[in-house]
Amino acid sequence: MSRRHAAEKREVLPDAKYGDRVLTKFMNNLMIDGKKSVAERIVYNALDRVQGKLKREPIEVFHEALDNVKPSVEVRSRRVGGATYQVPVEVRPSRREALAIRWLIDASKKRNEHTMEERLAGELADAVNGRGTAVKKREDTHKMADANKAFSHYRW
């Protein structure tokens, strides 16, 4: 553990089309091998597909989907006297957002539509409607935390 102060967070620039910082973070997470233009094209085309599907403003749909995937509690392992307990802890806002983004992208990659645009559009639409793999991941995380509520006094 470093004794120096924590590294300061760098602020990402808002994206070109919607002027949204969270969308830029999403694109950066989706990006492979530094190919940002490819990631941008995938995200923008997916948002256009979602707009056609749901007849709503794409950036609103994106944020609603993200909110439906954000976990409020998670479990962290804690060793106490030779036993390891799964202790439920509240998730801080920055991690909440990061987890939601990661889960949406992972769930999209595992879908079986033909292109990544279709997969991402499908996962976003499902997340808005409260179903889909990413939402299930959040529900499972909450269930784990609820099941281990008895160990919440081991919080640190």
From Swiss-Prot:
Which superkingdom? Bacteria
Task: Identify one Pfam family in the record.
Answer: Ribosomal_S7
One MF term in the entry's GO annotations: rRNA binding
User: What UniProt keywords are attached to this protein's entry?
Assistant: Ribonucleoprotein, Ribosomal protein, RNA-binding, rRNA-binding, tRNA-binding
Q: What GO biological process terms are annotated to this protein in UniProt?
A: translation
Keyword Ribosomal protein tagged: yes
Q: Where is coiled-coil annotated?
A: none
What CDD domains is this protein classified in? uS7_Bacteria
| Biological role | One of the primary rRNA binding proteins, it binds directly to 16S rRNA where it nucleates assembly of the head domain of the 30S subunit. Is located at the subunit interface close to the decoding center, probably blocks exit of the E-site tRNA.
Q: Which family, according to UniProt?
A: Belongs to the universal ribosomal protein uS7 family.
Query: Self-association or partners: how does it assemble?
Result: Part of the 30S ribosomal subunit. Contacts proteins S9 and S11.
- The protein in question is named Small ribosomal subunit protein uS7
List the source organism.
Paracoccus denitrificans (strain Pd 1222)
Task: State the gene name recorded for this protein.
Answer: rpsG
